[in-house]
Every structure is written in C-alpha cells, then in structure tokens.
Amino acid sequence: MERFRLASDYEPRGDQPRAIAELSEGIVRGDRDQVLLGVTGSGKTFTMANVIAAVNRPALVLAPNKTLAAQLYGEFRELFPDNAVEYFVSYYDYYQPEAYIPTTDTFIEKDSSINDEIDKLRHAATRSLLTRRDVIIVASVSCIYGIGSPAEYQAMHIFFHQGDEYGRDELLRKLVDIQYERNDLDFHRGTFRVRGDIVEIFPAHEGERAYRIEFFGDTVDAISEIDPLRGVVVQRLTKCAVYPASHYVATRETLDRAMEEIRTDLRERLQWFRERNMLVEAQRLEQRTMFDLEMMEEMGFCQGIENYSRYFDGRTPGEPPYTLLDYFPRDFILFVDESHITVSQVGGMYRGDRSRKETLVNYGFRLPAALDNRPLTFGEFTERLNQSVYVSATPADYELQQSGGVVVEQVIRPTGLLDPVIEVRPATEQVDDLLHEVRETTARGERVLVTTLTKRMAEDLTDYYRDLGVRVRYLHSDIDTIQRMQIIRDLRMGEFDVLVGINLLREGLDIPEVSLVAILDADKEGFLRSARSLIQTCGRAARNVNGRVIMYADTVTGSMQSCLDETARRRALQEAFNTEHGITPQTVKKGLRTILESIEERDYYTVAAVAETREEYISADEIPKRVKKLRKEMLDAAKKLEFERAADLRDQIKKLEEMELRLR
C-alpha cells in the first residue's frame, strides 16, 4: 500500500510533537471529532502533515476560501512531493446562475466562465481518489456540491494494455461517450485526434502530457506518453487509463433509463400545471425539457445537465447528491482549517441555493428534480464524515461541543515567538497617535496593519495619511483576489508600509514583516470586534519578534477583556517554555513565492493604490450607469450570501439616486 512520505528539513518543535502525538492517537483510537487550537505561526499545517503521515490515511483539508486553499495546496505539495496532493475548488471565474424574477417577469440565463486550469485540477483530484490511497485533497466548500456518481465515473473510464485486442473505431466511440471531442487541428485538454492508425488523447486531468495509442489492425501495438506541443515521446507505457472529460457522464443504459424517467416526470408536471390553468408555465417547461432531451439523445449531454443529475444517479426525490466526499474511501480524515469560519459556511450553502431553484420550478423553467441538484445540508455533510480534526486559533462553540470540550493546544511556536504585547489607548485622538506610531515603526523598516470599522473610515484614513507622506494603501471588498495577492506581495517587498482594511485583516494574512497591528474603535461591540475577531486580528502581529498591538478604545469591553486574558495566558506559557529551553525568539523567515499563479477567483479582496471615485464627482448622466452596475453587484453579493457587502452597495445606490434627484 502507498505510504505518505513527508519531505521536510525541519523536525517538529515547540508544542508540535505533543499535538501530533495526541491527534494521531485520537484518530487511531477512533475519536470522531478533535480540535487543534493552534495560535498564529505555530505551524498548524506542518502538524496536520505529520498527523496524515503518521496515520497514513487519505485526507480532505477543507479551507474557507480559494485563497487559503491555494496557500495550503502549495504547502502540502512541498511537504509531500511523492504523493498525490490535489486541489478541488469551484472552477468558475465568473458564474451567474439561472434565475427568474416574477415581479418583473425577468429570466436570467445561466452564464459562466470556466477556469480550465482549475477544471483540470478537479479531474486530477477525482482520478487520484479512484486510483490510489496516498491522497490529500485541499478543497473549498465547493466539495459539498454535486459532481455526479463516482460509480458511473469509474465505470466509464477506458483502460487498456499493450497487446490488447481493441479496435481503433471502438476506442473513438468510447471517447465520444465519455465527453471527449475530436479535434484534429486544436489539440487541447479533453480532446483527441486521429492520424491513420494512431490516436492521440489529451486527458482531462493533464495539462502537459497526452497519450499516443498506436494500432496494428485491431491490436494495441504501442502506448506512449507524449509532449502535446512538440509531439515527441516522453516515455513508453505498457498500460493506460483515460477518465471521463466530465463528471456528469453515464452509460448508454443509464442515459436511456434517465430520459424515460424525465419524460414520465414531464408528463406529470405538465398535467399539474394545466389542471391549475398555468398554460404559459406548461408550454415553457415542455419546450425547454424536450429540447434538453433531444440534445441528450443525440449528444449524450445538454446545457445544464446537472439539473437532471438525480435521474442519472438513480436517486429518489430529496435524496442528497453525490459529492467529492463520496469519492473518498470510508476511512478518510477531514481537517477543517479556520474551522470557526468554514463550518458555518457549510451550513449556509443549502438555503440560498434552494430558494432560487424553487422559483424556477414554480414558474416552469425546470422540473422539480432540479431541486435535487444542490449542495449537501449540514446534517448530510456530517453523516458522510468519518473522523474530523477542527483547526483554528479561535475554535467556535460547535467544534468545542463536538469534541466534548477536549482541545489539543499548540501555543508554543517553533520560532519561539511570543503572542504580541497588547496596549489599550484612548480612542479620542487615535488617528494622530497612530500616525506617530506608524512613523516610528516604518523608520525601522517594519510594516503596519490598521483595521477600521467602516469603508469610509478606511478611505479617509488612507487619504489623510497619504497626504502626510505615509506610503499607505487600503483593502476593500471591490478588489479581486489576484490584485489582493499582488498588494500583499508589494507590502512585503516594501513598495508601501501601511495597509488599512475592515474585515479583511484576519485569517490567512501571513506577513512576517508586520510588527504593529492597530485596531481603531476596538470598544465598538459587534461582529468585527468580537473576542474571536480581535484574537485573529492580533495574530497578524505574531510572526515578528517586535510584534505588538494597539487597541484604541475609551472603555474595555467584554470581548476586549477576553482577548487580553487569552493573549496573556498564551504569552505566559510561551515565555516559560522559552526560558526553560533557552530559546531566543526569531522573526519568521518566509520567501516571496506565489502559489498557483494560474488560478483566479473572487473570494478575498485586495486594494487600489488610490481611493475609488467618489459619488461627489459623478455627473448626472453617469449616475444611471453607475446605479445599474452597483445593483448587479448587490444582487451577486446577496446570492453569494455576502450580506454585509450587499447592504453597503444598497446604501451606495440610495445615495446616488438621491443625488440624481438633486442634480436634475
């Protein structure tokens, strides 16, 4: 059996050896849920890697967004170069789900842009799970959405050895059945080309290698792995497996059965509409469904085939879909990174998806079976788990309840770094006081993070400091991930010194050059100033030996006191350990590398070098265009359950509409 081989020049240090031993023993013992409370910079990823290597079982690492997933993917690939480390996130660069708005009788057609690189990585992930056990999949919550039956996916793959009796034409038919496209001119992933008795296949899970199958009559004469660009042979093979180009594939028998069930359900639904005199809905449903059936009959596929997945999977109404979790063997281990965020994300996906699809079904755009093309409910998700390890610096109540309150602590950092010193100062003159601290800190070549409560405050503070000569930028929710990564890289390289943000300076911001974190209006109780948020924000200063935090507040709230107490407790443990072992704290040394540069996404945000265009400078003629753009962004944000951003956009729209009335 394949084993995980951990490749690292480092040995576990600090609290890591104890945490690795306790978690590994818990898994072997059969503990269903465990919690790893690991402070920022304590090497939680390295601990997870050691646990995986120790228990030698397939693992799913669940991250709260694509950015952190990409970071973890890069780190695990470095730690396990000889094993299958895969990446499974949503493959959409842009996604507009189909929707119907009854009040305006507006149907919005599905529109999307698929990232080919991520699609390749998704196929590589499912292929690895079906062919080996030394697999680590790093995923976002995309893993709870339906992707088709693993049994059908496995059954439809093509496997042959050199010397097999296998006709060339038979191979071509099978390739078409599993959604490969013949293209003799543009050879790319998911296509094949034919040159006499030679068939070349570009597998869906590959980006740089293709297969060449040479026939002699009806015999497989030779199999080679080739460079698809140059056409040269890389290596000779004795066997070869080609997996489907889509996760939604089915045998001809399954397809015929599914189409018959669709026709039966269509007849019943049409009768239901007609009995209620809903003739427009009946005509609409019949036209759309019959078109899809014709496409399935001819091509074995249709646009939006995922809405019929229940029929292909043989599921009953209401039964959960097959997801990535069903591709794992039963004994897999789940690691939930930043669990205080990720767990709640899993729970929220089902409800938003359901309400949109119910409208489509009620107005005749989809059969009721479309409701079963959905993410898992939270209960269905937990039913599919074997053993879980929740990883966070601030575990939430759910995780603690699941583990019975038992927590494996990882408070001591391998670098000997202490939690930052926290100082509370009055908020009355916070801007000018912070300016003095910023100048002192940047004079030493160190960086500063500043977190505010509102976008306007972030903008105004940035403008004010920039006018005074401070090299400053700010993070806000209109900036996409690629820009965000570039901004953080620029901060680390010293292109600027101060980064201002709102709720974006918490999890996953790994910047060792930052020695000062300033929290403005720290005494304003709420989501952004909860104890958990404050601890996470303070953690951004924990990778620098000079790390410190200034909370600007006129009173010490309960959340602030909890943060102060927890930080003091951790510092006491860390100082005692360093004294006992003669350790001198050292700032984390981290290279400026970019992970997974080809991947684009929209889960996190970056910063513009200048503030956005203010409403005051918009002419009356420009306002309608601006309102239309903002309204679309607001609806998109609401669909993604980003209600804080949607509310902010709503307020901007209201201001612009009021301004238009004044100007006209």
From Swiss-Prot:
Stored Gene3D superfamilies: P-loop containing nucleotide triphosphate hydrolases, UVR domain
Classification via InterPro entries: Helicase/UvrB_N, Helicase_ATP-bd, Helicase_C-like, P-loop_NTPase, UVR_dom, UVR_dom_sf, UvrB, UvrB_inter
Keywords: ATP-binding, Cytoplasm, DNA damage, DNA excision, DNA repair, Excision nuclease, Nucleotide-binding, SOS response
Boundaries of every Helicase ATP-binding domain copy: 25-414
GO molecular function annotation: ATP binding; ATP hydrolysis activity; DNA binding; excinuclease ABC activity
Free-text domain note: The beta-hairpin motif is involved in DNA binding.
Subunit and partners: Forms a heterotetramer with UvrA during the search for lesions. Interacts with UvrC in an incision complex.
Major subcellular site: cytoplasm
Name of encoding gene: uvrB
NCBIfam families: PRK05298.1 (NF003673), uvrb (TIGR00631)
Keyword Heme: no
Pfam families in the cross-refs: Helicase_C, ResIII, UVR, UvrB, UvrB_inter
Top-level taxonomic group: Bacteria
Record's subcellular location: Cytoplasm
Residue ranges occupied by any UVR domain in the UniProt entry: 624-659
Role description: The UvrABC repair system catalyzes the recognition and processing of DNA lesions. A damage recognition complex composed of 2 UvrA and 2 UvrB subunits scans DNA for abnormalities. Upon binding of the UvrA(2)B(2) complex to a putative damaged site, the DNA wraps around one UvrB monomer. DNA wrap is dependent on ATP binding by UvrB and probably causes local melting of the DNA helix, facilitating insertion of UvrB beta-hairpin between the DNA strands. Then UvrB probes one DNA strand for the presence of a lesion.
Native source organism of the sequence: Geobacter sulfurreducens (strain ATCC 51573 / DSM 12127 / PCA)
Protein family membership: Belongs to the UvrB family.
Motif Beta-hairpin, residue range(s) on this chain: 91-114
This protein's record includes keyword Transferase: no
UniProt: ATP binding residues: G38, V39, T40, G41, S42, G43, K44, T45
GO biological processes: nucleotide-excision repair, DNA damage recognition; SOS response
GO cellular component: cytoplasm; excinuclease repair complex
The name this protein goes by in its record: UvrABC system protein B
